[in-house]
Structures are given as structure tokens and as C-alpha cells.
A protein has these predicted regions:
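Polybasic, low-complexity intrinsically disordered tails and interdomain linkers
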Residues: 1-48, 104-126
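Short, functional N-terminal and low-complexity linear motifs
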Residues: 5-11, 55, 80-86
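Extracellular/luminal Protease-associated
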Residues: 35, 44, 49-63, 68, ...
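Short basic, glycine-rich beta-strand/loop surfaces that mediate nucleic-acid
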Residues: 64-125
Length: 126
């Protein structure tokens, strides 16, 4: 049984995780996705990130725990999901991915879905 690290908050439930992974696949299809911790950090620091997704099973977890702090500084919603391999698959990569983000100025076909996920994450936090 997987016991997530208590430092990883907010952790998406199964339904929200599926919706997030579907959104990531759509963003990848529209070339609107930044994959990996380094690209995610760069996008957050520039203020371009619309939404950040972090894998809770990153080993060690400390390599991604700075991302929530960066997101909070820039008022960017973030969420942890359970599986880095599923995140990598959704990003279109055969390897695991520990973090990704959807940059601002997304394709108009994704705007409503991004807003919907952002609202769910904000409700999840509060």
C-alpha cells in the first residue's frame, strides 16, 4: 500500500488525478506543456505557469518540495498526484516525470478545462 509523504499537500484524489492526467495529455497534444522539474521551475520563476502538477512518489521527495513554495510566491495553483510513471505517460514520455506545468496563454480549446481544474484544486486546498 502506498503511503504518501505528509509533506505532499494537497494530494489529488483518484477522480481529480484522472482529470489532471487527461488535461496533461490534451496540453501535450497542443504543445502547451512543460515537462520535468527544471522546465517547471523556469516557467514558474518567469510567472508563466498556469497550473503545476508534482509527483508525490519522487524519491527523495525533497527534490520537489521547493516547487510548492515557488508556486505560493507566484500565486500559482499546484497539486500532488500519486504516480510519477502515470505523469510521464501523460506527458508523452516513456520515463517517469516528477513535475510538469501548463504555461499561461494556453490554447483556447484548453482554457475552460484549465480553469475547471484550477477551481477544483483551490477547493481542495480550502
Amino acid at each position: 500500500m502506498f503511503n504518501p509523504n505528509p509533506k505532499a499537500f494537497p494530494l489529488a484524489d483518484r477522480e481529480l488525478t484522472i482529470q489532471i492526467l487527461d488535461l496533461i495529455e490534451l496540453a501535450k497534444a497542443h504543445n502547451q506543456l512543460k515537462k520535468g522539474a527544471n522546465e517547471t521551475v523556469k516557467t514558474i520563476n518567469k510567472g508563466y505557469a498556469e497550473l503545476t502538477i508534482i509527483a508525490v512518489d519522487s524519491d527523495p521527495i525533497e527534490i520537489v518540495l521547493h516547487l510548492p513554495l515557488l508556486c505560493e510566491d507566484k500565486n500559482i495553483p499546484y497539486v500532488f498526484i500519486n504516480n510519477k510513471h502515470a505523469l510521464g505517460h501523460a506527458c508523452g514520455i516513456s520515463r517517469s516525470v516528477i513535475a510538469c506545468c501548463i504555461p499561461a496563454g494556453v490554447n483556447p480549446t484548453l482554457t475552460d478545462q484549465v480553469k475547471n481544474i484550477r477551481n477544483k484544486i483551490e477547493k481542495f486546498i480550502n
